[in-house]
Amino acid sequence: MLFEGLQWSVPEGSVVGLLGKNGAGKSTLLHLLSGLLFPKSGAIALGQHLPKDRKPAFLEDIFFLADDVAYPGNMSIGEYERVMGAFYPGFDASQFDQILADFGLEKKVKLKELSLGERKKVFLSFALSTNCRFLLFDEPTNGLDIPSKSVFRKVVAGNIKDEQTVIISTHLVADVEKLIDRVAIIDAGKVQLDADLLELSDRLLFNTSPNLPEDSLHAEKYGTGYQFIRSRSGSEAQTPVNLELLFNAVLNKSLSNESIFQTQNSEVL
């Protein structure tokens, strides 16, 4: 069994980075959330929707961009838009045109003539243009080169609305670092850490030092010194969350929700 006793909730309007090693269950979790797989026990809800019911009102308000998308190869991008756009009441054709242009793609090209990365750009452009309330992206930067990843970050940041909830699963932490406002790290069938980045920045300090700090919660060699995480005192300036370092700390059992936030509760008491 991949997940047992899994409990997870996402605040509405969040952009969540779902992180985990390959095989940790990120894709399976997204399939469960989208209603393409069914839990053997327990319940899943997205807003008022139960994904397992696959009702039309739910299907037109969610878009799941899988890592490997099945596509009608003989269709051009424009034909794909006309056929698939009809299923999504919020689809915006002008928005689709603009995002395609940002990626340097033309509608007349057939999907089968595109590379993996180019097809990924088409489906990502379409997903954002549906304006669905729930967007689930599974490894969306797979197949993208470095310049395309930069465009990916810009188009996602520029096309997400406050009321949308977005979950981006990836093992490439740097690709989503500037996009997300919340992080969930799964390992061993459980969500080991689930937190708002502002909360983490308030609780933890991320820094480097030539020597290994005695009070570090997690540290790694970095050049000739160390990069580390330690508890932050209220008088210290906040630092940006180093997602890669945080990810490694959680997988190494150096940090968890309990170790971060129970400490906070005890300090308040």
Model-found features: residue ranges?
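Conserved ABC transporter NBD signature motif
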Residues: 42-53, 57-58
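ABC transporter nucleotide-binding domain
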Residues: 151-230
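The feature captures the beta-strand-to-loop junction immediately N-terminal to the Walker
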Residues: 19-21
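Conserved structural motif at the start of ABC-family nucleotide-binding domains
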Residues: 3-5, 59
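Catalytic Walker B motif of ABC-type/P-loop ATPase nucleotide-binding domains
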Residues: 135-139, 144
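Helix-to-loop junction immediately C-terminal to a conserved catalytic motif
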Residues: 34
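ABC-family P-loop ATPase nucleotide-binding domains
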Residues: 60, 64-122
